[in-house]
């Protein structure tokens, strides 16, 4: 890329940075005064004319200044040399806050609240997807001789409790055998494989009485737990930030709120996140959803080095602090993965 192209990108970078900070259209005189561009105001005006002709900036109404277009934001994000990381104190505060979560639900609630505060946007966290989870532990507890409590714990920290009503009473020895058989069938397996294993076990021990009946009833309840679609659950925080930024959205605020409530668009975008640590920025039309006009989403996956638990990110107007938002999303995702992976 030639020096003129590089110079024009520096002009674009300055326009994006100033517009994000001030919300005001940016003129050539302002750019020369605020930034060390090393050229005259006339040269900057010429560069802005080229950027406008190429679709990177536009003139709103009768203002003499210019604002970035979605194409301009895209170029700015694609050419971010580096994203300033959060300070050590900020990272430590995030880690301590998330580690204080008592269980999966609490950790995710803390994460979404924290991310909304850090970015001043709408924060979204997807519950761990079942397809990537492994059964870490199964507990079978007798509430009465004919009533059991099944507790399934996955490696992502998800805890599911189910009641099993037996057709007949079982004694302590039979309870121990039932716990052992179900544990051998489930523990250490991905949930998809575990559901097959428990169904096979029920088929092998099919019997109207004795332990076969207990296994069959337990299997029916466990299958409900193992195939339940928790990946369709989202946590959101900071929706009040939408109204604070209402003037920045190019489309209808109502349509954005409806899209968030329906969750379909958001789930589709989060489902595309398959690599922990990789942050994706979708600007305006790139969300491929009419309801999301004028919005950007910064998303990533969270999990361990070898397992993705789910997706997370923020939604806000295209006039967004992209470097700061990317850094915050990446940091919170990393610590969610560490906290859940250590449990």
Curated annotation (Swiss-Prot):
Origin: domain of life: Bacteria
GO molecular function: DNA binding
Keywords on record: Repressor, Stress response, Transcription, Transcription regulation
TM stretches of this protein: none
Keyword field contains Repressor: yes
UniProt-listed GO biological process terms: negative regulation of DNA-templated transcription
Its biological purpose: Negative regulator of class I heat shock genes (grpE-dnaK-dnaJ and groELS operons). Prevents heat-shock induction of these operons.
Homology family: Belongs to the HrcA family.
Protein name: Heat-inducible transcription repressor HrcA
Source organism (scientific name): Mycobacterium avium (strain 104)
Gene expressing this chain: hrcA
């Amino acid at each position: 890329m030639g020096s003129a192209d590089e110079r024009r990108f520096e002009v674009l970078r300055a326009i994006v940075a100033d517009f994000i900070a001030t919300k005001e259209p940016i003129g050539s005189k302002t750019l020369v005064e605020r930034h060390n561009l090393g050229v005259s105001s006339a040269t900057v005006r010429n560069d802005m004319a080229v950027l406008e002709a190429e679709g990177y900036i536009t003139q709103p109404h009768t203002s003499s200044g210019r604002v970035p277009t979605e194409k301009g934001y895209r170029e700015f994000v694609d050419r971010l040399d580096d994203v300033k990381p959060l300070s050590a104190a900020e990272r430590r505060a995030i880690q301590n806050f998330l580690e204080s979560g008592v269980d999966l639900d609490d950790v995710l609630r803390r994460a979404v609240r924290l991310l909304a505060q850090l970015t001043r946007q709408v924060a979204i966290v997807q519950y761990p997807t079942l397809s990537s989870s492994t059964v870490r532990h199964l507990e079978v507890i007798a509430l009465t001789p004919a009533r059991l409590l099944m507790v399934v714990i996955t490696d992502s920290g998800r805890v599911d409790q189910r009641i099993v009503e037996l057709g007949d009473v079982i004694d302590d020895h039979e309870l121990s055998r039932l716990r052992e058989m179900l544990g051998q069938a489930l523990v250490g397996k991905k949930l998809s494989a575990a559901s097959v294993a428990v169904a096979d076990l029920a088929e092998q021990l099919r019997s109207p009485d004795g332990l076969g009946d207990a296994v069959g009833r337990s299997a029916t309840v466990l299958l409900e737990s193992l195939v339940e679609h928790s990946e369709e659950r989202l946590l959101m925080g900071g929706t009040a930030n939408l109204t604070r930024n209402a003037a920045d959205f190019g489309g209808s605020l109502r349509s954005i709120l409806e899209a968030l409530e329906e969750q379909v668009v958001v789930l589709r975008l989060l489902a595309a996140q398959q690599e922990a640590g990789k942050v994706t920025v979708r600007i305006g039309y790139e969300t491929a959803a009419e309801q999301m006009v004028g919005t950007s989403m910064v998303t990533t996956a969270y999990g361990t080095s070898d397992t993705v638990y789910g997706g997370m990110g923020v939604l806000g107007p295209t006039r967004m602090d992209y470097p700061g938002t990317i850094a915050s999303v990446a940091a919170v995702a990393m610590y969610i993965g560490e906290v859940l992976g250590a449990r």
